[in-house]
Swiss-Prot record:
Keyword Secreted found: yes
Keyword vocabulary terms for this entry: Glycoprotein, Glycosidase, Hydrolase, Lysosome, Secreted, Signal
Recorded superkingdom: Eukaryota
Glycosylation sites per record: N65, N405, N440, N586, N621, N646, N848, N908, N912
One Gene Ontology molecular-function label: alpha-1,4-glucosidase activity
Protein name (database record): Lysosomal acid alpha-glucosidase
UniProt entry tagged with the keyword Signal: yes
Signal sequence segment: 1-17
Active site: D455, E458, D585
Family, similarity comment: Belongs to the glycosyl hydrolase 31 family.
Length: 923
């Protein structure tokens, strides 16, 4: 047993039914009456740490081998506890340092006498993939001597720069609370999420890692602005220009106190202290790819999901949805998927469809993808299962619900349908229960989803803790209060702790289930099994949404979806192998539009690149100008979806009859997305689950210090630069806005136009910085192709669905001059069929369908002669024939007379082509 609890715990017994451990409870936790209300409690460490009288003194240094050392240290002070009597001070610690690869190092701090919650080393969770243990590595480690206080200093060997330093920093390791500080050598730190930052580069403040249902949260340095996910990693740029990633492998509640450019303090409530350090080079991608591999990378989403999505809370009937579908089609707006919020459910209950409002025939007409107009459908699913529903009874039969430590029965929370039970996704039958429920949408109602949107999965709860069966829920908008809910009426060991993450305004036990709720913890558990340990919500909370994502992924595969598409609100480091993400409830305000790029940058760093923000904003009424600008940039989010609340005005692109520029801009922007769709998607395919796709500009130009704080433009891969308008026009009557150009200090870019090929586009460099570009409300945002790179596009003006795009392409070649020749390079994929089956068979894992393209041009009289080299990424690259119907060239000192040349790509080899020059350019 881990905790020496001052309160009697529930008696837990295992009743074996087949191979499943069924856990029951013999009595409630406390003998106190359930109407006892305790006085307010302030955790003793809430306003800062309490100094220790002693330190952890090294007793033994055990050199296991050249790349593994153990440090044993003992606390030499008089204290037996820290901050409060029940929080035992851990007096004997073991620090294990292992270098498992030339650029990867692990630090694990454990106690030698008490058992803490430890994230398993299973395929579900982050774990090492490489075990080279090289004696010749990139790390220079300074350790204390015997008799000295414990510390660590880790440097990059070739530059001598410090990457991890705890010397002279406060450190405490106790039963319920750890505090650990790392010195920062400069201010260039990114990551630490999930959160919605005012800027991509971090400012000083307190930042919380706790999966929480928190509406329109914006991180401002106060600890109460947590959001839906936990990613305790950061990317730091060293003074030499090299990058590294540090990850804290802990999924308990954490609060980080950052002093800009000075230090980062981790305040950790439970679990272990385990750090992983990944040394990269001067490209941020290098260290991030190492990190992504460690957290198991990201799975590929289906091609159709890369199209545009339309959603709102407020599509109350299938007739409303078909009207949206019809109007999109009539206006020539490309889109692939229509979504349903909770409106489609009967009585807001999971696994049901209200057939009085959602007509099967209407829905299936819309979802008939055997005809050109058919689309996909993605409905929302919440975590709570309504009491009294047939699905709830099925869950009770299987015994899969979360138990209450206070009543011994299924824990009762409150969400949209009222009283609910939550599945314990650690239970071995939970995945089958969940799959059965999701499949009932087809089995019982004859309507088949293509993916799922899993929401409220932190788990969210409209009350704090739980209620008993004879109590009523307080729902949003209710003015009554009930202080006697079980979650806050009796003392709970797990809510009266030394430090509470989130601060006084939004404490960690707010809006979720009781932290003392027991989790299934037998050998057949689905997510976590910790032998001889009392596994509770206290430790498992941040894993709820992760575990539901695994179950939903399993369900979709069981339904025949080879590449599951799941948009999950809650996520952790490692969720990308199962789900995708949207950034949650935002506001229809210019600020939220500006924040959105940084949010998506973060999730590309976290390893969940298929992420987007609610386009035009979720809450409050949008405006025509804001929606037009948001559609311009949102059309290029990895996950692109317009979504708003039921109490706001319609904001579909066509919903502004007095401001037709919204429709015009949306149509142009979405058609450009679809023209680029296969090129954009190819970045996800060829990445093989690691690296970023939608990234800040400095990722491609890391030596340009002026870009390190620029979060108002983006790169898609290596080749496309977007400079959206993110501010309101000062002169809206002109229906345009003047933006200042900002380009990297090296390289050059060209205006990028598709649909109508434009020759001799304008070239831009940093010499153009500060110049003004006028961007109209009805236009596409400024988009540029990078000199030295290629981009494949398609004529997408008539293809309103991704599956209608053919295998004919135009090749844009932005040539960089090198001596007397011109060069460009790129990457693409070689398939015609973008179905799940073909992608899996030809492109994923050990399979490969990516090729590199290298273009070299030489002026030859009246032409620019091009040599195009095609090389598959591996000897086994699968080629399907694709057609290039036109080459569109760009070059700084050449003027082209036409864009010509037609060829096919079907194998490795060399292709020759010529582009005619204008007469004045001919030699």
């Amino acid at each position: 047993m881990k905790h020496q609890v001052l309160l009697p715990l529930l008696v837990t017994t295992a009743i074996i039914a087949g191979s499943v451990g069924v856990y029951t409870h013999s009595k409630p936790l406390l003998g106190q009456s359930q109407d006892q209300v305790l006085p307010p409690f302030t955790p003793p460490l809430q306003n800062g740490h309490i100094d220790l009288q002693g330190k952890y003194i090294v007793s033994t240094l055990d050199q296991v081998n050249a790349t593994h050392i153990n440090i044993y240290a003992n606390y030499n002070g008089p204290e037996a506890s820290y901050a409060m009597p029940k929080n035992k001070l851990i007096t004997h610690i073991l620090v294990s340092i292992v270098i498992n690869d030339v650029n990867q190092l692990g630090i694990k701090i454990t106690d030698r006498t008490y058992r803490h919650f430890e994230v398993p080393y299973s395929n579900l969770f982050p774990h090492d993939k490489v075990f080279n243990f090289p004696a010749n590595n990139q790390f220079d480690i300074t350790l204390p001597k015997r008799g000295e206080a414990f510390y660590l200093t880790i440097k990059r060997k070739d530059t001598g720069e410090v990457v991890f330093d705890t010397n002279n920093q406060f450190f405490v390791y106790s039963d319920l609370y750890h505090e650990f500080t790392v010195a920062m050598q400069n201010e260039f730190i990114y990551g630490l999420g999930e959160r919605r930052n005012k800027q991509f580069l971090y400012d000083s403040g307190e930042y919380t890692f706790l999966n929480k249902d928190q509406y329109e949260s914006v991180a401002d340095g106060h600890p109460d602005q947590q959001t839906y996910g936990t990613h305790p990693m950061y990317l730091r740029r060293e003074n030499s220009g090299n990058f590294h990633v540090v990850f804290l492998r802990n999924y308990n509640s954490i609060q980080a106190v950052y002093s800009k450019g000075k230090s980062l303090t981790y305040k950790v409530v439970g679990g272990l202290l385990e750090f992983k350090i990944f040394l990269g080079d001067k490209s941020p991608e290098t260290s991030l790819k190492l990190y992504h591999s460690y957290v198991n990378g990201f799975n590929l989403h289906p091609f159709w999901a890369h199209g545009f999505h339309q959603c709102r809370w407020g599509y109350k009937t299938s007739e409303m949805m078909t009207t949206v579908w019809d109007t999109f089609n009539t206006n020539g707006l490309p889109f692939d998927t229509i979504w349903s919020d909770i409106d489609y459910m009967k009585d807001l209950t999971d696994f049901t469809i209200d057939t009085s409002r959602y007509d099967k025939a209407q829905m299936n007409t819309m979802l008939d993808r055997s005809v050109a107009a058919g689309v996909h459908w993605v409905p929302i699913i919440d975590a709570g299962i309504a009491l009294g529903d047939v699905s709830n009874e099925r869950g009770k039969e299987l015994g899969v619900y979360q138990k209450s430590n206070k009543t011994g029965e299924d824990l009762i929370g409150c969400v949209w349908p009222g009283k609910v039970n939550y599945p314990d996704f650690n239970h071995p039958l939970s995945q089958e229960f969940w799959a059965e429920g999701l499949m009932n949408l087809t089995k019982n109602y004859g309507i088949t989803p293509s993916g799922f949107w899993i929401d409220m999965n932190e788990f969210s709860n409209f009350i704090n803790g739980e209620i008993s069966e004879d109590q009523n829920c307080i729902m949003p908008g209710d003015t009554t209060t009930n202080p006697n809910y079980l979650g806050n009426s009796v003392e709970d060991f797990y809510t009266r702790i030394p430090f509470e993450v989130g601060g006084a305004d939004h404490p960690q036990q707010e809006k979720t289930m009781s932290y003392d709720a027991p989790k299934y913890n037998y050998a057949d558990a689905k997510t976590v099994y910790i032998p001889n340990y009392e596994l509770r919500e206290f430790d498992f909370h941040n894993l709820n949404g992760f575990s539901e994502g695994i179950a939903t992924n399993y369900a979709l595969k069981k339904m025949g979806n080879k590449l599951p598409f799941i948009i999950s609100r809650s996520q952790i480091a490692g969720s990308g192998q199962f789900v995708q993400h949207w950034t949650g409830d935002n506001g229809s305000q210019w600020d939220f539009l500006q924040y959105s790029l940084g949010e998506i940058f973060n999730f590309n760093m976290y390893g969940i690149p298929m992420t987007g923000a609610d386009i035009c904003g979720f809450a409050q009424n949008t405006t025509a100008e804001l929606c037009a600008r948001w559609m311009q940039v949102g059309a290029f989010y990895p996950f692109s979806r317009n979504h708003n609340s039921n109490d706001t005005i319609p904001q579909e692109p066509y919903a502004f009859p007095d401001s037709t520029y919204v429709l015009d801009s949306s149509k142009k922007s979405l058609r450009l997305r679809y023209a680029l769709l296969k090129q954009y998607y190819s970045h996800f395919v060829s990445s093989n689950g690691v690296g970023t796709v939608f990234r800040p500009t400095f990722f491609n130009f890391p030596d340009d210090a002026s870009l390190l704080t620029n979060d108002q433009q983006f790169m898609i891969g290596d080749s496309l630069l977007g400079q959206p308008v993110l501010v309101q026009s000062a002169t809206p009557a002109r229906f345009s806005h003047s933006s200042y150009l900002t380009f990297p200090s090296s390289g050059a870019f060209y205006d990028f136009v598709t649909d109508v090929a434009t020759l001799n586009a304008q070239r831009y460099t940093n010499a153009n910085n500060g110049q003004i570009k006028n961007v109209k409300f009805d236009d596409i945002m400024p988009l540029y192709i990078r000199e030295g790179y290629t981009v494949f596009t398609q004529l997408a003006s008539t293809a309103l669905r991704s599956r209608l795009l053919d295998s004919n392409f135009e090749l844009h070649v932005a040539l960089a001059k090198s001596g007397t020749s011109y060069t460009a390079k790129g990457k693409f994929i070689t398939i015609q069929d973008y179905s799940d089956d073909n992608l899996i068979q030809k492109c994923i894992g050990a399979n490969n369908c990516s090729f590199d393209i290298q273009v070299t041009g030489v002026v030859n009289g009246a032409n620019l002669d091009l040599t195009i080299q095609i090389a598959g990424e591996s000897a086994q690259t699968n080629f399907e024939t694709i057609n290039v119907n036109k080459i569109i060239p760009y070059a700084a000192d050449l003027k082209f007379a036409a864009s010509t040349a037609t060829f096919t790509i079907s194998k490795n080899g060399t292709i020759n082509a010529s582009i005619p020059l204008q007469a004045a350019q001919q030699e």
